[in-house]
């Protein structure tokens, strides 16, 4: 028997049909619109045979199980973002407790750098070792890191454990999106990714609230004592609920498949680039030998990384083909710019509220709800729109447009700005973020190959984190340099000036200097204004870059390529070629279903990316694909190339006889016109 993959003429679903030696065939259904062969031993970058066989981990679930697994993924995403942003409002208190007022920004920077360094790796690791195993490792890492943060006695210990938290959080957010992409179809993916985006906003809301509540009433350490068991619950849920399609191959084969040169070069490049960028202007002088040498080394390894990925890696962590079209390149640029703007807001809005407005941690967290709650709501709405309408471009345009309006409004903030201006600015920005985060991801998946699904997600998250790290470093330098320049013009006591310059992110106690309070707050306001002005054109650039994104609907890259090919083949057939240019052993389906070819030597049938082997088809049958068959192979049974193919839904179905090798399927009676 030979197998053939096609779809119903009414629904965007793939139907696998097996035609045996009688005019009957079993039918099974797979609800995914994405199609690729399982265990394809193909070098994904160069099309050559690879020693490691990639395993298709698509695992479409029945609805009841889907809701359970997706709920677990949503909970993991919530915990991850609670952990990432829960300590932002507590940093001033942590700095005082650990005597680290001049270095406390590294509590956030260390996690973000570690997140960025490892983010690019998770896609390929999950391809090689399986989603479940890698997921369990990163969740256990998060639990251990949070326990370490809770027990930290020095700032150095805290920064190290926050770095491990960053490694784990990067894996959790990335793998959650990959798993959801495995268990739902592309058409439904916008809806489910939208709910995940809502969990991001919810985590960004709950985390600061819990951090503020624990800091003011218990201790900042209590935040981590809460997050650690929540992470443990994630591990238990993943272990018992997440289904696993374990990739084939031995542990040695899997270990050899890792792109070690790429991993080494990317890690060295990012560390050597981000550390001086994060500390330049505040902890290190920009023209110091250390900063210059680290930037040069990082730049060299960054170039080496892309050379390795493009020309030498057999299984690259970041295949350069994901930048190969204008649309995909624009979407990846979105990720970098979006990371700069979004992380800048997350870190510098609370600073404005606490340092300049003098609000408590709880009030600052409450004001931030205007942004993150709106983000959560609009993410769900935009995801529903994507799934129902099958389009994404107008959502992305609207998102970056309204985000730009909010960023412009933020540039008019003053020390005494009224609440209406603040709230509407945050509402507009939150709505914009909600319409950009997940729709850009769904668009990138729709425009890329199925086998690139995991690396598209990890690369996109990596670029967003990289943009965030660079953006925070630049914003930090802008604020520090603005404060220095502004305070030099004021007649401040030297001890107060040195105190501010050494720790620009932690407002000193001005009760001892009441006469200088307004001057210091004005300097902080000018610095924050400069940061907001810097972020505004970044968002505007995202809007401009969107013109390069094309909306082809929620179809897979393979399906669009197949349709383009068959349209060309149909044109040839209608122009009178009558299949004359087909090579021996081929059959052409000249409608919108792709090219069907048979290799007579291996007795195999190919449809698109799918292959089915065994015996030839019987004489006098019609393949259940809507279209017209043409063939010129003597090895094929005779058939009229003008026979009209009966639509699948017109076939009569009956149970297979007990002797059938596919007894779990259904018999389809082939009908001829």
UniProtKB/Swiss-Prot annotation:
Disulfide bonds: none annotated. It holds the Pfam family MFS_1. The chain crosses the membrane at residues 67-87, 103-123, 133-153, 164-184, 194-214, 222-242, 261-281, 292-312, 322-342, 364-384, 393-413, 419-439, 465-485, 529-549. Keywords: Cell membrane, Glycoprotein, Membrane, Transmembrane, Transmembrane helix, Transport. PROSITE patterns: MFS. Its main location: membrane. Disruption phenotype: Abolishes citrate export. The keyword Endoplasmic reticulum does not apply. Residues 564-596 have a biased composition (Basic and acidic residues). It is a multi-pass membrane protein. It is found in: Cell membrane. One of its GO terms (molecular function) is transmembrane transporter activity. It comes from the Eukaryota. It catalyses: citrate(in) = citrate(out). Residues 21-39 have a biased composition (Polar residues). Transmembrane transporter that exports citrate across the cell membrane. Belongs to the major facilitator superfamily. This is Citrate exporter 1. It comes from Yarrowia lipolytica (strain CLIB 122 / E 150).
């Amino acid at each position: 028997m030979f197998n053939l993959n096609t779809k119903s003429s009414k629904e965007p679903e793939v139907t696998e049909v097996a035609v045996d030696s009688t005019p009957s065939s079993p039918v099974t259904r797979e609800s995914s619109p994405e199609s690729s062969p399982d265990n394809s031993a193909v070098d994904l970058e160069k099309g050559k045979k690879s020693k490691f066989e990639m395993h298709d981990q698509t695992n479409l679930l029945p609805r009841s199980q889907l809701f359970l697994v997706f709920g677990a993924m949503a909970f993991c995403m919530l915990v991850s973002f609670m952990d990432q942003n829960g300590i932002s409002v507590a940093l001033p208190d942590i700095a005082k407790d650990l005597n680290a007022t001049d270095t406390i920004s590294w509590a956030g920077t260390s996690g973000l750098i570690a997140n960025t360094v490892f983010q690019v790796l998770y896609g390929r690791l999950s391809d090689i070792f399986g989603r479940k195993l890698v997921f369990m490792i990163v969740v256990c890492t998060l639990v251990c890191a949070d326990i370490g943060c809770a027990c930290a006695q020095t700032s150095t210990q805290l920064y190290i454990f926050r770095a491990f938290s960053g490694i784990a959080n990067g894996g959790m957010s990335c793998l959650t999106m990959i798993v959801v992409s495995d268990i739902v179809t592309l058409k439904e993916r916008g809806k489910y990714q939208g709910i995940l985006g809502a969990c991001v906003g919810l985590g960004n809301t709950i985390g600061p609230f819990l951090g503020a509540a624990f800091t003011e009433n218990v201790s900042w350490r209590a935040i981590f004592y809460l997050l650690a068991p929540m992470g443990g619950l994630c591990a238990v849920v993943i272990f018992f609920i997440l289904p696993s399609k374990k990739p084939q191959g031995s542990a040695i084969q899997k270990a050899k498949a890792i792109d070690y040169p790429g991993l080494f070069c990317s890690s060295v490049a990012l560390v050597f680039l981000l550390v001086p960028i994060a500390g330049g202007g505040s902890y290190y002088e920009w023209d110091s030998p250390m900063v210059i040498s680290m930037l040069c080394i990082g730049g060299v390894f960054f170039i080496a990384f892309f050379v390795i990925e493009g020309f030498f890696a057999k299984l690259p962590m970041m295949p350069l083909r994901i930048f190969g079209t204008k649309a995909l390149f624009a979407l990846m640029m979105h990720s970098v710019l979006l990371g700069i703007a979004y992380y800048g807001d997350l870190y510098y809005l609370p600073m404005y509220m606490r340092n300049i407005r003098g609000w408590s941690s709880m009030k600052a967290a409450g004001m931030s709800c205007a942004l993150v709650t709106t983000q959560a709501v609009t993410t769900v709405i935009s995801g529903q729109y994507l799934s129902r309408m099958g389009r994404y471009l107008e959502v992305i345009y609207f998102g970056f447009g309204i985000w730009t309006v909010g960023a412009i409004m933020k540039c008019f903030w003053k020390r005494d700005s009224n609440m209406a201006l603040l709230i509407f600015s945050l509402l507009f920005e939150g709505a914009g973020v909600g319409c950009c985060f997940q729709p850009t991801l769904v668009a990138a998946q729709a425009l890329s190959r199925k086998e690139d699904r995991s690396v598209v997600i990890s690369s996109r998250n990596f670029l967003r984190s990289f943009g965030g790290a660079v953006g925070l470093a630049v914003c930090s330098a802008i604020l520090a340099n603005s404060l220095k320049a502004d305070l030099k013009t004021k007649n401040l006591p030297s001890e107060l000036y040195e105190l501010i310059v050494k720790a620009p992110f932690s407002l000193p106690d001005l009760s001892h200097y009441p006469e200088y309070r307004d001057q210091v707050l004005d300097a902080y306001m000018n610095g924050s204004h400069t940061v907001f002005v810097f972020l505004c054109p970044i968002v505007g650039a995202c809007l401009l870059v969107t013109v390069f994104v094309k909306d082809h609907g929620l179809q897979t890259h393979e399906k669009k390529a197949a349709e383009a090919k068959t349209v060309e083949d149909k044109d040839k057939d209608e122009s009178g070629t009558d299949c004359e240019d087909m090579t021996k052993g081929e059959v052409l389906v000249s409608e919108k279903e792709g090219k069907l070819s048979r290799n007579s030597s291996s007795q195999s049938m190919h449809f698109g990316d799918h292959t089915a082997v065994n015996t030839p088809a019987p004489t006098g049958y019609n393949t259940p694909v809507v279209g017209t068959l043409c063939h010129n192979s003597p090895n094929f049974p005779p058939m009229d190339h003008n026979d009209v193919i009966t639509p699948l839904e017109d076939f009569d179905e009956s149970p297979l006889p007990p002797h059938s090798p596919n007894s779990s399927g259904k018999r389809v009676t082939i009908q001829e016109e």
